[in-house]
From Swiss-Prot:
Gene3D superfamilies: FAD/NAD(P)-binding domain (3.50.50.60), GidA associated domain, C-terminal subdomain (1.10.150.570). It comes from Rickettsia prowazekii (strain Madrid E). This is tRNA uridine 5-carboxymethylaminomethyl modification enzyme MnmG. Homodimer. Heterotetramer of two MnmE and two MnmG subunits. GO terms for biological process: tRNA methylation; tRNA wobble uridine modification. FAD binds at G10, G11, G12, H13, A14, G15, V122, S177, Q366. Its cofactor is FAD.
Length: 621
């Protein structure tokens, strides 16, 4: 009888990372997806990264995940977002050649050790004594396994909406999964509906680019993956246009025909990626909205007009596009649509992403209420790691808010749940100064090495980089100038007669790496990424010291367990409202309790005192 350690259902961004992570840990893994071209499919925009999202990609790469490496082999337009602000909120982003991205992903996965791929449809999951036993395919056959990672994306009872037209689909032209939705309902999971959308696709050959604004990428693309030296994929430009008053009039006149505004859609859409209908209604005083014209490939004339996601009827979509500068004669290749799908309340899962109800069943991606390729991939790699570690009877791998954006996301989901598609932002992290894109590998790769999910190749790269960091730091500490000489160069420092090292100078707000290289040309030979890392660490040194103290407090509270049988109503010094909230959420630690909305610092102090008195008294009896 064929049996796998881990089976992953779904070959999207969560699924491929889960499958690869499980396989890297040496567990016999099966990835089941409908067809080969589904592997790593970019269902919506052809891009990876962005503000906070780019940091997620770097964290996935730090754990030897695939996304960063694959985008570096298929990225056609790189841009660092937010670069005029501090490094803590920089957002690496790259447009992808959609077909090339899938091709590279397919090549990697089909040659991955310990990984089999089956093109089939899963209809059900066989459970015995609240434990995963097998998956059941549409042809009735069973494949037995120890663990299942469910990464279904928008396919759970998915419905596409284009105006009044409503059709069952998990993605346009692809059938949804009713079987697995029924499985989850039968097992008693709390299920609700969410919605997302995508814009129409346009034939780039029919666009008048002279009426648009050119958007160039970075002159020197900065790779996502630590395994990538340089980006050798040809780079191309994007373009920007905008809606007009005529566009807005057409949308307002046809709002009753929009699936969103006619009451046809029940699910809540993503707050930070609204449809064009939402923009016109909620920002009614705004005269125009920007539209980014993003090429879908080097040899593909399809253009993705980022900013006009819609569920309006096809004929209305055609009409409104004609009112946009540069698109007056544009040909629509495919209409935009909204898609509604099932998701499970993420409070039904643990921080390992294993469900609380069923042992061996893990959820990752949009099934947990998130939106975005990067959020899905971040969950996928954690689910795959933990499923494989469980097969091997090893301790789970848990990332916290203090170590990663992935940890922030999982903690938010499992603690608070979500009623709208969850998207990662830098503002969600209280430790974002230390959780930057540039130091993701320094935060996570060592942790990955300890559990065995890092390949030997990356381990060598990482070890070499760490040595180079120490050598470069030593060099920067040895290169110094007197304050008088610095003053002659126009660099303002306190004239105390002391020598100032390059690391000292990095703390000056106006001083940067380029100036350091100009003063000491020997630095040209050093790795620029390492120089930038040390520059940022020096620049933020005083702030980071305070943040590390906060992190130490956080970590101490994270390990301060709250007994499962605690009765909050017996703590007289906290209000009834807080007692009810704590009883409902059942936080496992003091740290989790503190993060629940409405829980005051005074109530946390009261709980700590109560635990010390009650449980120390009981232990002394």
């Amino acid at each position: 009888m064929l049996k796998y350690g881990v089976i992953i259902i779904g070959g999207g961004h969560a699924g491929v990372e889960a499958a690869a992570a499980s396989a890297r840990l040496g567990v016999h893994t099966l990835l089941i997806t409908l067809k080969p071209e589904n592997l790593g499919e970019m269902s919506c925009n052809p891009a990876i990264g962005g503000i906070a999202k780019g940091t997620l990609v770097k964290e996935i790469d730090a754990l030897d995940g695939l996304m960063g490496f694959v985008i570096d082999k298929s990225g056609i337009h790189y841009k660092m977002l937010n670069e005029t602000r501090g490094p803590a909120v920089w957002g690496p982003r790259a447009q992808a050649d959609r077909k090339l991205y899938k091709k590279v992903m397919y090549q990697i996965l089909t040659n991955y050790r310990n990984l089999d791929i089956l093109y089939a449809k899963v209809e059900d999951i066989q459970i015995k004594s609240s434990k995963v036993e097998a998956v059941i395919l549409s042809n009735g056959s069973k494949i037995f396994c120890q663990k299942v990672v469910l990464t279904t994306g928008t396919f759970l009872s998915g419905f596409i909406h284009i105006g009044s037209i409503k059709m069952p689909a998990g993605r346009i032209y692809e059938e949804p999964s009713y079987g697995l939705s029924n499985t989850l309902k039968r097992l008693g999971f709390k299920i609700a509906r969410l919605k997302t959308g995508t814009p129409p696709r346009i034939d780039g050959r029919t666009i008048d680019y002279s009426k648009t604004a050119l958007q160039q990428g970075d002159q020197i693309p900065r790779p996502f993956s630590e395994l990538t030296d340089v980006i050798d994929v040809p780079q191309i430009n994007c373009f920007i246009t905008k809606t007009t008053s005529e566009t807005h009039d057409i949308i307002r006149e046809n709002l009753d025909k929009s699936a969103m505004y006619s009451g046809q859609i029940e699910g809540i859409g993503p707050r930070y990626c609204p449809s064009i209908e939402d923009k016109i209604v909620k920002f009614s005083t705004k005269l125009e909205h920007r539209i980014f014209l993003e090429p879908e490939g080097l040899e593909d004339y399809t253009i993705y007009p980022n900013g006009i996601s819609t569920s309006l009827p096809e004929e209305v979509q055609y009409k409104l596009i004609k009112t946009i500068p540069g698109l007056e004669n544009a040909q629509v290749l495919r209409p935009g649509y909204a898609i509604e799908y099932d998701y499970v309340d993420p409070r039904e899962i643990n921080v390992t992403l294993e469900t609380k109800k069923i042992t061996g069943l893990y959820f990752a991606g949009q099934i947990n209420g998130t939106t975005g390729y990067e959020e899905a991939a971040g969950q996928g790699i954690i689910a795959g790691i933990n499923a494989a570690l469980s097969v091997k009877d090893q301790a789970p791998f848990i990332l916290t808010r203090a170590t990663s954006y992935i940890g922030v996301m999982i903690d938010d989901l499992t603690t608070f749940g979500t009623v709208e598609p969850y998207r990662m932002f830098t503002s969600r992290s209280e430790y974002r100064l230390s959780l930057r894109a540039d130091n993701a590998d320094l935060r996570l790769t060592e942790l990955g090495i300890k559990i065995g999910v890092i390949t030997e190749k990356r381990k060598k790269f990482f070890t070499k980089k760490c040595k180079n960091i120490e050598k470069t730091k030593l060099l920067l500490n040895n290169l110094s100038l007197t304050t008088s000489k610095l003053a002659k160069m126009g660099i303002q420092v306190a004239q105390d007669g002391k020598y100032k090292t390059i690391l000292d100078l990095f703390k000056i707000p106006s001083f940067n790496v380029e100036q350091a290289i100009k003063i000491f040309p020997i630095l040209k030979k050093q790795n620029n990424n390492i120089l930038q890392l040390l520059y940022i660490e020096a620049k933020y040194a005083s702030y980071l010291t305070r943040q590390y103290a906060d992190i130490n407090l956080f970590q101490s509270e994270e390990i301060q367990l709250i007994p499962k049988n605690i009765d909050y109503f017996k703590i007289p010094s906290i209000s009834l409202e807080i007692q009810e909230k704590l009883s409902y959420h059942k936080p496992a630690t003091i740290g989790v309790a503190r993060r629940i909305s409405g829980i005051t610092p005074a109530s946390i102090t009261a709980i700590i005192i109560y635990l010390k008195t009650k449980y120390s008294d009981e232990s002394s009896k």
